[in-house]
């Protein structure tokens, strides 16, 4: 097996003119630009593309997080011979910069010291424009997640509008969508051979802009940018056409008119076969961030992946809110056992390896092969059909034996103490396996105290719109997990990922979920609101209010208050959420749940707040601040001056939160009566 020795690589690719000259280079062939700090690890797209081009014999420089106020950083190496390959980063720059509430984030795990601000908003577009400004005559190939998900006209959550393809906005010559290795190598070879970029229009896995007279002979067309920006039904229909043509076997060329020109999406590139994946992951990565970041606090994103191994790509899970099916695709491919074991063996020789491999996984850890034989001949099913939801397809091939053999080999390596699985297990696929050997060994050897799983919700309607299996499947998995953990003598826990406000999720659904969590003694710490990122079916539903496969209306919670109520219900047990939880339960006429879901501490706080609101006068000032004054009932007129008010500490004029006295503690008997009143409120109705 090539590169199966214990060699640890230490040489980074050039990041400056001085690095070039140290290698004796006068000119680079290509510059690879990335939105993340330079981390030479195969979990980072910039590292894969730059090492792949290096392996093809090209002179490569890496321009990581260039200064974006002008184009001078793009001239750092001098003019490259053939062009630029640009990516926005591992995470969409807008998701990296803003929370789902559109609040700016201060942190960025992919930047030096974990600090935000090192990349611009919409970094893929900004970097492309700067490269074109620096060298207008050089080709720019734009790839990566951010570009892939914006290749068609798309709804932009942050501007709350529909934008044209990133090909139009950025000015890139070619958009490379998907994982990109095949496209990168072919484009580089053709540019190096002297072919003009304008004629490179037939590469699978790429998009380009052209005029009507130069469209390909055969294609399927979806509604254009102006149409989908003004007609939500047209947007939903276009979404279905795009999703139905992302398979390498059954997909067709898709055309969509933008402002003036037409976007042409060629069929997706073929996934890398096993030996090709092995080759990519055997490239000489240093597996660490560049030393220039050491004094800045390093790059936090390396912590979890430095001693993790990617064993597969693609996911046939088909979650509607997930970007993987539009980027990596639904066909699963995987590396050979020898390749994975060789990478693990190399890790054991690294100086800071402590014996723990954090993960052997991928988009879904326990997928190793395509979901069925039919897809190899006819392609993946279209029309919104899922391999695993609402039930497991009868054609599904369920087999964990190959994955299990790999885990056994790695955990037997000298120097390896534990091998964990942290990238997520698809529990419905696991439960479909009649052989529970993998499940037993998962519990025995590969859980680091907690196992991440993603039921996401429990309401049937919401799960259907998510593309997730019914909650009964998760219940069976949960019961078996704890049963096997008990037999193994281990105290281990499930960490369920849950989502609020997904299209289709009503307030009643959120209350149903809170009741489910209470009855199952679950207190999730990791919850999130649905984040409408470009390129997903769920985002289409969020924007249009329609199911793109049926065109039937879908309820979408878009108000800030409604979203806050749904999120609070997921963490009903937190006293800080008491007011929102009580309000939600009253709105849904489920007051019977108040004494169960709302802690006594939270109920008392809500009662005190209500009493204060009833016994206070509020004056709102012109600057938006307000003053709270006690309502002196029976002690003078409402127009009584401040000087005549009772002695004591007075609210500061204009204070946003005026001080108030702490109420005296009630006798225990009175408090018990109040608690009893909460519990019997439903009966009194």
Task: Tell where the protein language model's regions lie, with residue ranges.
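Conserved SAM/AdoMet-binding glycine-rich loop
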Residues: 32, 48, 67-68, 346-495, ...
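Terminal amphipathic helices with adjacent charged low-complexity linkers/tails
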Residues: 69, 198-247, 260, 269-272, ...
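Intrinsically disordered, Lys/Arg-rich low-complexity segments
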Residues: 609-614, 618-685
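Flexible glycine/acidic-rich beta-alpha junction loops that bind and position SAM and/or redox cofactors
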Residues: 92-101, 149-151, 181-186, 210-214, ...
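Glycine-rich beta-alpha loop elements in corrinoid/cobalamin-binding modules
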Residues: 19, 45, 64-258, 265-266
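N-terminal [4Fe-4S]-dependent radical SAM core
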Residues: 2-27, 37, 236-308
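N-terminal pre-triad scaffold of radical SAM enzymes
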Residues: 36, 296-323, 348, 356
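Conserved, mostly hydrophobic/aromatic
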Residues: 173, 280, 315, 340, ...
């Amino acid at each position: 097996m090539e590169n199966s020795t214990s060699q640890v690589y230490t040489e980074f690719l050039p990041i400056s003119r001085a690095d070039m000259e140290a290698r004796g280079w006068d000119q680079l062939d290509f510059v690879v630009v990335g939105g993340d700090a330079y981390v030479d690890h195969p979990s980072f797209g910039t590292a894969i593309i730059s090492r792949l081009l290096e392996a093809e014999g090209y002179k490569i420089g890496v321009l990581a997080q260039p200064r974006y106020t002008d184009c001078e950083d793009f001239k750092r190496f001098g003019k490259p011979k053939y062009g630029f390959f640009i990516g926005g980063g591992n995470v969409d720059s807008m998701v990296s910069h803003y929370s789902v509430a559109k609040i700016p984030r201060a942190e960025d795990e992919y930047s030096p010291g974990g600090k935000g601000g090192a990349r611009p908003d919409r970094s893929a577009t900004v970097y492309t424009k700067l490269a074109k400004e620096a060298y207008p005559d050089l080709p720019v190939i734009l790839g990566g997640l951010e570009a892939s998900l914006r290749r068609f006209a798309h709804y932009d959550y942050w501007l709350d509008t529909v934008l044209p393809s990133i090909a139009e906005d950025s000015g890139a010559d070619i958009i490379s969508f998907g994982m990109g290795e095949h496209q990168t190598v072919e484009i580089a070879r053709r540019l190096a051979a002297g072919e003009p970029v304008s004629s490179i229009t037939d590469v699978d896995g790429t998009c380009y802009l052209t005029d009507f007279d130069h469209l390909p002979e055969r294609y399927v067309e979806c509604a254009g940018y102006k149409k989908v920006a003004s007609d939500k039904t047209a947007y939903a229909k276009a979404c279905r056409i795009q999703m139905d043509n992302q398979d390498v076997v059954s997909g067709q060329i898709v055309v969509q008119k933008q402002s003036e020109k037409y976007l042409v999406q060629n069929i997706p590139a073929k996934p890398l076969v096993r030996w090709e994946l092995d080759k990519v992951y055997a490239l000489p990565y240093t597996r660490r961030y560049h030393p220039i970041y050491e004094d800045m606090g390093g790059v936090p994103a390396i912590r979890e992946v430095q001693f993790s191994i990617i064993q597969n790509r693609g996911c046939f899970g088909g979650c509607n809110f997930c970007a993987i099916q539009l980027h990596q695709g639904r066909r699963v491919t995987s590396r050979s056992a020898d390749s994975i074991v060789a990478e693990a063996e190399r890790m054991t020789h690294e100086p800071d390896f402590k014996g723990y491999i954090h993960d052997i996984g991928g988009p879904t850890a326990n997928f190793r092969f395509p979901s069925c034989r039919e897809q190899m001949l006819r392609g993946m099913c279209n029309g919104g059909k899922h391999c695993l939801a609402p039930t497991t397809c009868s054609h599904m091939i369920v087999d964990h034996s190959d994955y299990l053999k790999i885990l056994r080999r790695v955990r037997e390596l000298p120097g390896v103490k534990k091998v964990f699985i942290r990238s997520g297990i698809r529990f419905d696929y696991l439960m479909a396996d009649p052989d529970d050997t993998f499940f037993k060994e998962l519990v025995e050897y590969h859980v680091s105290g907690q196992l991440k799983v993603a039921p996401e919700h429990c309401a049937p309607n919401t799960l259907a719109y998510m593309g997730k299996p019914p909650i009964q499947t998760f219940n069976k998995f949960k019961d078996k997990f704890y049963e096997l953990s008990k037999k193994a003598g281990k105290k281990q826990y499930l960490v369920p990922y849950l989502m609020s406000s997904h299209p289709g999720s009503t307030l009643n659904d959120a209350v149903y979920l809170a009741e489910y969590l209470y009855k199952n003694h679950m207190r999730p710490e990791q919850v999130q609101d649905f984040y409408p990122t470009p390129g997903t079916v769920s985002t289409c539903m969020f924007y249009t209010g329609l199911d793109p496969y049926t065109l039937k209306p879908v309820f979408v919670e878009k108000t800030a208050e409604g979203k806050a109520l749904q999120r609070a219900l997921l963490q009903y047990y937190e006293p800080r959420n008491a007011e929102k939880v009580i309000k939600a339960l009253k709105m849904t006429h489920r007051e019977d749940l108040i004494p169960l879901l709302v802690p006594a501490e939270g109920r008392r706080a809500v009662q005190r707040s209500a009493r204060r609101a009833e016994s206070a006068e509020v004056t709102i000032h012109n600057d938006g601040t307000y003053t709270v004054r006690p309502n002196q009932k029976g002690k003078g007129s409402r127009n009584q001056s401040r000087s005549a008010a009772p002695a004591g500490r007075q609210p500061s004029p204009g204070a946003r939160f005026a001080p108030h006295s702490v109420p005296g503690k009630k006798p225990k008997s009175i408090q018990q009566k109040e608690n009893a009143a909460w519990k019997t409120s439903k009966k009194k109705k």
